[in-house]
Amino acid sequence: MTPASRLKVQPGERVLDLCAAPGGKATELGAALQGEGLLVANDINTARAKALLRNLELFGISNSFVTNEPPHVLAERFPEFFHKIMVDAPCSGEGMFRKNPAVVDSWKEKGPEYFSKLQREIIVQAADMLLPGGMMFYSTCTFSPLENEKTITHLLKERPDMEVVPMEDYENFAEGLTSYKDEAFDESCKLCRRIWPHKMSGDCLLYTSDAADEG
């Protein structure tokens, strides 16, 4: 049920984990490659990228390398290159409030409005690195529709060759929203899946699978 397992990586594919540190998802993606193909694990934070590198080395993911670049730089270097892309986006962390009250202070400084803008930039840049017919998985650990369904709606407007594809359901998964207050989102956002902490053990998450058109 992890985000990495939902991406269904196959041996021999080229895979990007765009916001990868500290490496839990990256190591799972790397293991799925079974030593074949390529994993690029990126994090914009230098200290976190070093931790990411250590974890990949500890897990013996030899067909990987770590980058420490903003997404737009990677997008310039790897246009239409990857079969699979993981975007576990930086977010306001509302789903972590119960686990870590200190996140509330960070949220007051940089809330959903700040991260929504950042996510909209990241997801389009990520889409530009996806091969035709490839798959991208977007996830956050926050409740805000601004950081979830609004981000997906923005992607679908900017890259109309992309579509949201259904994923296997689990009990207590909730559909994504198609509207919030006075704002409407793309109808396909109902294919997104929300995990609520009062319905399932753990933190709040949103999962979305985006597939590039074969075009």
Could you describe each region identified by the protein language model?
Residues 34, 130-131:
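Helix-to-beta-strand junctions that scaffold the AdoMet/dcAdoMet cofactor pocket
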Residues 30, 124-127:
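A structural alpha-helix within SAM-dependent methyltransferase catalytic domains
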